[in-house]
Amino acid sequence: MKFTNGFWQTRAGFTPLFAQEAYDIRTDGTSLEVIAPTRVIQGRGDVLNRPALTVTVSSPAEGVARVRIEHWRGTASRPGFELAEGDVGAAEVTESGGVLRTGDLEVRIRQGAPWSLEFWDTSTGTRLTGSGHKAQGYLTGPDGAAYLHEQLDLGVGELVYGLGERFGPFVKNGQTVDVWNADGGTSSEQAYKNVPFYLSSRGYGVLVNDPGLVSFEIGSEAVERVQFSVGGEALEYLVIQGPTKKDVLRRYTGLAGRPSVVPAWSYGLWLTTSFTTSYDEETVNSFIDGFAERELPLSAFHFDCFWMREFQWTDLEWDPRTFPDPEGILARLHERGLHTCVWINPYIAQASPLFAEGREKGYLLRTASGDVWQWDMWVAGMALIDFTNPEATSWFQEKLRVLVRQGVDSFKTDFGERIPSEGVVWADGTDPEAMHNWYTQLYNRAVHEVLEQELGEGRAVLFARSATVGGQSLPVHWGGDNTSSYVSMAETLRGGLSLALGGFGFWAHDIGGFEGTPDPGVFKRWLAFGLLSSHSRLHGSSSVRVPWAFDEEAVEVTRLFTRLKLSLMPYLFAAGAEAASTGVPIMRPMALEFEDDRSAAHLDTQYLLGHDLLVAPVFTEDGTVEFYLPRGTWTSWWTGERTVSTGEWRREVHGFDSLPLYVREG
C-alpha cells in the first residue's frame, strides 16, 4: 500500500507521523522498550498533544529479533501466527542507546534523534538492515482508518525473494505485494499461498507476524527500502539472521513449523479423473488398465469433485449413481498396489445433508445478524465450516474418518481462499480480516490430523492448494489452476520456487496444465518437468491426462521419466527427510544453493532437485533450452559426459525424451 506522492509529499487524505527519536530506552535484561515520540523533544512542552510509539525488542529464539510497534495498546490487536515462543535475548542500555543480543544477531537502538534501529550480524561484522528517517510510521487515512508501517533499508544490489507462492518475477524488487489469499490462477498477481516472510540476498529474513492483510512495497515506493504496512494500532515483525539463506530457513521453520515426513508412495505418479470429465468405476478401471497394459508405473489414483453428487458438495458421501460400492472400488484399487485420494473442500452446499445439521448445531459461519453466511459462488447456497469452533472441527473430522476407514489414503484439500472478511462473526471472536488468510491453516490441519491419527505418523499426506505461515508443516501443496501452455508451465515453476523460499519442502503442479487441453508437445515437456518435481500428478479440468490420449510418444515419455523418478527414490526420500528436519526444500532455487554466484541470483527457469541434481525444464516447441551451469564439476545424466564449469551458460536442444539434467560431483 502506497502512502506517499514522491519523497516529499503524502497521498491525499493521509496524515503520517514518524518515530523521530529514541527518547527513553528501558530494559528488563532480556528485552528493550523504547518510547519513540513523533517529534523531537526539545522541551517539556513537546511531550504533550502528540502521539508516541512504543517499540519493544525481544528475542523468541537465538538469532531472531522481534520488534513490536504500538500506538494505542488499549485497542484490541490481532493475534499473530502460531510461532515457537522463547525469551533468549540479552539486553542492556548504555549512554549511547540500547542493545539486544541473540546469538550472532545484534539489535542497536541509538539514544536520541534521529531515529535509528539497526540489525547487525556480529559473526561477519555486517549491518544487515535498519529503520531510520521516516521509516517507522503511524498514519491515518481519509476514512479515519489507522495504519502502521515499517521501512527496512535495502543495500546496493540487495535482492528480495519469497512472500509465498507468487507467479510473477522471482526476484521481488520493484513489486507491490498484498498478502491476501485469493483464487486467481497462476497468470495473475494473486496467490493461493501468501506468506508475509521474505528472504534477502544479504543473509537475513523478515516475517511480519500478522495473519491479516499485509501490504509490501519492495523498493517500489521508497526505492531503497522494503515497506510493510498493516491496518490497526500494532505492527510486529521478526528479523531472522543467517548468515546463509539456508540458515535463515532453518531458523524460520524452527519458529513457524517444519514439513512433516510424507509417505514414500506419495513421491510416485498420481493419476486423477480430472475435474468436469464424466467418470464412473468403469472409467477409472479403464485408465488404470491402460497404465498396466503399457507398463507405466502408477502410485495413486485421485477422485475429483464428482465422486460426490452435484449440488451437494461437500456432503462427503459417494454418489451412488456412479460409485455404488465405494468400499469395493477402494479395496480393488489397493489390491492393484494403488493408494487413493478424494477431493474435498470446506464449503457446505445448501443441498447437502450436512447443511441442515451444521446450521442446527451452530457449526457454520454466521453473519453479524446471526444468519448462516451463504453465497452462490462455486456451489449454490454454500456455507462455510467454522473451524474456530472445536465442535465443528470434530464434526467435520468424524465425517472424514468414515472415508479413511473405507480405504481413502489422502485428501485433496481444495479451496480455502474465498473466506469473507466483513460482516461475519467467528465462533471464537477472531477478527474476520485475520481469519481470511488463517482459515486455510485450520482447515488443512483438521484434515491432516485425521490422516495422522487414522494411518499413523509419517503416513499423512494432503494435496492442498491454499496456505499461509505454518502451512509448510502440512504437505503436500500444488500450484493451483494453470493453463496448458509453455508460458504457464514457466509461471508455475516461478510460483513453486518462490514458495520454496518460505520453507515449503514439497510441491507439485498439474502436469500438462489444468485449463485447456495441451498439445502433445506441451504435455510431453511438462511430463519431464513434473516427474522431476518432488510430487507428480496428472490432472486437468475438462479433459483427461492419460498419456495415450496425446500420442504414443507421450506414453514412452511417461514410462521413461516415471521410471527415472522411481530410481531416484532413495535420494528423494533423503531430501524429504532433510526438508522435515531443516526446512530446506527438495526443489531448490539456484539462488538458495549458489549464494556467492551472482549469475544464479535471478534464475527462475531451472532448479536443483535435492542437493545434487540440476534440472532445466524445456519451455520451447523446438526443444531449445538455455541454462546456467554453476562453477564445479557436473556430469550429464544422459550421456555421462563430465564438464568442469567455471560458471557458464549453455544452449542445448533436446528431444522429448530428455532435458538438461546434471549431477553435481560429490
Predicted regions and their residues:
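Generic recognition of flexible, low-complexity loop/linker segments
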Residues: G43-R44, T54-V55, D183-T186, K193-V195, ...
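Short, glycine-/Ser/Thr-/acidic-enriched flexible segments
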Residues: W72, P114, R202-Y204, P211-L213, ...
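Aromatic- and carboxylate-enriched substrate-binding clefts and catalytic-loop regions
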Residues: E70-W72, E82, R110, P297-T558, ...
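Conserved, mostly hydrophobic/aromatic
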Residues: V57, D104, F197, F291, ...
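Beta-sheet entry/capping signal
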Residues: V64-R66, V99, E106, S116, ...
